[in-house]
Amino acid sequence: MKYDLIIIGSGSVGAAAGYYATRAGLNVLMTDAHMPPHQHGSHHGDTRLIRHAYGEGEKYVPLVLRAQTLWDDLSRHNEDDPIFVRSGVINLGPADSAFLANVAHSAEQWQLNVEKLDAQGIMARWPEIRVPDNYIGLFETDSGFLRSELAIKTWIQLAKEAGCAQLFNCPVTAIRHEDDGVTIETADGEYQAKKAIVCAGTWVKDLLPELPVQPVRKVFAWYQADGRYSVKNKFPAFTGELPNGDQYYGFPAENDALKIGKHNGGLVIHSADERVPFAEVASDGSEAFPFLRNVLPGIGCCLYGAACTYDNSPDEDFIIDTLPGHDNTLLITGLSGHGFKFASVLGEIAADFAQDKKSDFDLTPFRLSRFQ
């Protein structure tokens, strides 16, 4: 059998692509080295932020707004346990922060619902937060967080129900490009398709070693917190920049545990074996202490944590491009630790590619040619 589309890597983007392409009527094969959702990539840990006024650059705003529409649609499949939670996101940092300047610019350009607060305004609204006098907050009322593993599970189930073939726990060992399509090699045999999507995350270089993607081991952890920090008490998700430039992110507490992680830094690794579990690196449990001590002093001890992996591009912007010399293969990689919120729209872009549809978005900033 020859498929219309083979998806290599069925984590966040791959799961979405499988659903949207199958729903569009294509004959699709989803593959993954493990059984998604799983603990081997970048999507585990239950939650991911979604921010609209994007501090990483205005070029992302059209993508994230479309992503939000698709997340809202997906959430309707899980109304008892919604995939998207509109908690709001407060972005904290010094008044001269370049990141916050980008947030403000994105909000202005796209007329997004963002409220600016000074330090006193932040602490009056959320007494649990402490910031210096020179800090500001940009509060995104319409943003919040996503339940990442539930989203992937839902997409995979919906794709399967729509007739998508799924080959999991079976790594792709090679990709061959031929005149009439793409062939993948697996322990289960060879499979052919007219087109392929490669969204294999951290270990994409195992298949395509020429790609400029660097795996980085990252950690996040849950700390003891009471009901004051919960969504029910209107405590928001957050990003926070310390005076030294370190960037943190976190979520409202659930079950008396607040999740927080540090966005920058991490341990460069070169193989999956190097991504050791949480707490096997001495600094894992204390990485968030500088932020907690200064900004959230009421949070308690570290309860537990997890390690994940970023697939960083050299400039930490996405790579969305066809494989050089092979227009029938689309790469979506280098998501650099800020990609999950875009998984829905990236999956839709992949499905459009498989149907020979022109994308509605300007993807020029994400081309591989920028690294030449």
Curated annotation (Swiss-Prot):
Its cofactor is FAD. Its EC number is 1.5.3.-. Binds 1 FAD per subunit. The keyword Flavoprotein applies. Pfam families: DAO. It comes from the Bacteria. Keywords: FAD, Flavoprotein, Oxidoreductase. It catalyses: N(alpha)-methyl-L-tryptophan + O2 + H2O = L-tryptophan + formaldehyde + H2O2. Gene3D superfamilies: D-Amino Acid Oxidase, subunit A, domain 2, FAD/NAD(P)-binding domain. InterPro entries: FAD-dep_OxRdtase (IPR006076), FAD/NAD-bd_sf (IPR036188), Me_Trp_Oxase_MTOX (IPR023493), MTOX (IPR045170). One of its GO terms (molecular function) is flavin adenine dinucleotide binding. The modification S-8alpha-FAD cysteine is found at C308. SUPFAM superfamilies: FAD-linked reductases, C-terminal domain (SSF54373), FAD/NAD(P)-binding domain (SSF51905). GO terms for cellular component: cytosol. Catalyzes the oxidative demethylation of N-methyl-L-tryptophan. Belongs to the MSOX/MTOX family. MTOX subfamily. Monomer. This is N-methyl-L-tryptophan oxidase. The gene is solA.
